[in-house]
UniProtKB/Swiss-Prot annotation:
Keywords: Glycoprotein, Membrane, Signal-anchor, Transferase, Transmembrane, Transmembrane helix. InterPro entries: Heparan_SO4-6-sulfoTrfase, P-loop_NTPase, Sulfotransferase. Residues 36-407 are lumenal. It comes from Danio rerio. This is Heparan-sulfate 6-O-sulfotransferase 1-B. The active site is at H149. PANTHER family: HEPARAN SULFATE 6-O-SULFOTRANSFERASE 3, HEPARAN-SULFATE 6-O-SULFOTRANSFERASE 1. Its main location: membrane. Glycans are attached at N262, N318, N329. One of its GO terms (cellular component) is membrane. GO terms for molecular function: heparan sulfate 6-sulfotransferase activity. Its EC number is 2.8.2.-. 6-O-sulfation enzyme which catalyzes the transfer of sulfate from 3'-phosphoadenosine 5'-phosphosulfate (PAPS) to position 6 of the N-sulfoglucosamine residue (GlcNS) of heparan sulfate. It is a single-pass type II membrane protein. The gene is hs6st1b.
Length: 407
């Protein structure tokens, strides 16, 4: 190699070193100036740590609390042992967005051993990482093992026995964590009417209570024939036995307290009071519940409760089958009257939900400030008098957080 060729090689090498060094410098500078935009350690683009807070709405500082809840009702922090004996039980109330949430549970949770969901199959296999036992009891994992859309009364009496049978052994050490979703009662009612109008019946539901199903006299049908397809909203509202009325309270309450479906056991006013208070208590004691109208907040509280992360953030949909229903004020008032217990429960549930979100968000921000202050104190770039909380995050808006009309 002559001197000319040697000089050309040296110049080329120096040029490549300069280019590579410049690229690395720009990457480091870009990450420092705009952290979180490029995230090498976060699969599926899901932001972790402080950046992950930016996808969640800032609590409304002007929110006025309606009910008093002690800290024990606001604090939800479960050491969920997926390798142990813990089981999440999803109580799926019709037309609350439970199908979408149920799919999130089997397809969108970051797990050591993800659920095995195969095309064409209605159920996924959700085994624990260390053995072939399920950690999730839901429609998309175990199927309707306790009956179609089993309620609180059915699930609490059925789930332990079903799992013992499936796993061929009795386990008294299992911990069951019940979860559910609620929805604005008027929107939910209209969505159920639309669903029934298209031919849905849920007539295979068991409604098991105190060891038996209700008699035809206790639970008369609203229609003759195979289904109620084509029914008008007026017909739907006029049936006094319609299980759509106050469905959320009925499915969350302990029906044994009122004689199940036998309406003659307890006077109507007392029955309503017992059902509402029971539903409130059971909802309050659940490990977690979400609201259809607040998808991002629902995601946030679930993740913080169970220490499980979703791969993709939840989306809020406002285009639904119930959205196109034009109602006058009298009809809306009639639906609210038919669902008076659900209206009261939802008002209670929404307030508790918002207070839990505010409380948990406050704890997270406090923890981040402490970590940021600790990092700033030990930072080699720290100057005297500098540090503190750093630049505050701009407030984010709830993603379409208004009451939506359906699911």
């Amino acid at each position: 190699m002559n001197d000319t060729e040697r000089n050309m090689v040296e110049r080329t090498s120096k040029f490549l070193l300069i280019v590579v060094g410049s690229v690395f410098f720009m990457l480091i500078l870009y990450q420092y100036v705009a952290p979180g935009v490029i995230n090498f350690g976060s699969p599926h683009g899901y932001l972790l740590g402080e950046e992950d807070m930016t996808i969640f709405p800032t609590p409304d500082p002007h929110y006025v609390k309606k009910y008093y809840f002690p800290i024990k009702d606001l604090e939800r922090k479960i050491d969920f042992e997926i390798k142990g004996e813990d089981v999440i039980v999803f109580l799926h109330i019709q037309k609350t967005g439970g199908t979408t949430f149920g799919r999130h549970l089997v397809q969108n949770v970051r797990l050591e051993l993800p659920c095995d969901c195969r095309p064409g199959q209605k159920k996924c296999t959700c085994y624990r990482p260390n053995r072939k036992e399920t950690w999730l009891f839901s429609r998309f994992s175990t199927g309707w093992s306790c009956g179609l859309h089993a309620d609180w009364t059915e699930l609490t009496n059925c789930v332990p026995g079903v799992l013992n049978k499936r796993e061929s052994k009795s386990k008294k050490m299992r911990k069951f964590y019940y979860i559910t979703l609620l929805r604005d009662p008027v929107s939910r009612y209209l969505s159920e009417w639309r669903h029934v109008q298209r031919g849905a019946t849920w007539k295979t539901s068991l409604h098991m209570c105190d060891g038996r199903t209700p008699t035809p006299e206790e639970l008369p049908p609203c229609y003759e024939g195979t289904d109620w397809s084509g029914c008008t909203l007026q017909q739907f509202m006029d049936c006094p036995y319609n299980l759509a009325n106050n469905r959320q309270v009925r499915m969350l309450a302990d029906l044994s307290l009122v004689g199940c479906y036998n309406l003659s056991t307890v006077p109507e006013k007392r029955r309503s009071q017992l059902l509402l208070e029971s539903a409130k208590k059971n909802l309050r004691d659940m490990a977690f519940y979400g609201l259809t109208e607040f998808q991002r907040k629902t995601q946030y509280l679930f993740e913080r409760t169970f220490h499980l992360k979703f791969i993709r953030p939840f989306m809020q949909y406002n285009s639904t089958r119930a959205a196109g229903v034009d109602l006058d004020n009298d009809t809306i008032q009639r639906i609210e009257e038919l669902n008076d217990l659900d209206m009261k429960l939802y008002d209670y549930a929404k307030d508790l939900f918002q207070q839990r979100y505010q409380y948990k968000h406050m704890l997270d921000r406090r923890e981040q400030r402490l970590l940021r202050g600790h990092a700033s104190f030990h930072s080699p770039f720290r100057e005297d008098g500098a540090g503190g909380e750093g630049t505050a995050r701009l407030p984010t808006e709830d993603y379409m957080n208004h009451i939506i009309n359906g699911w």
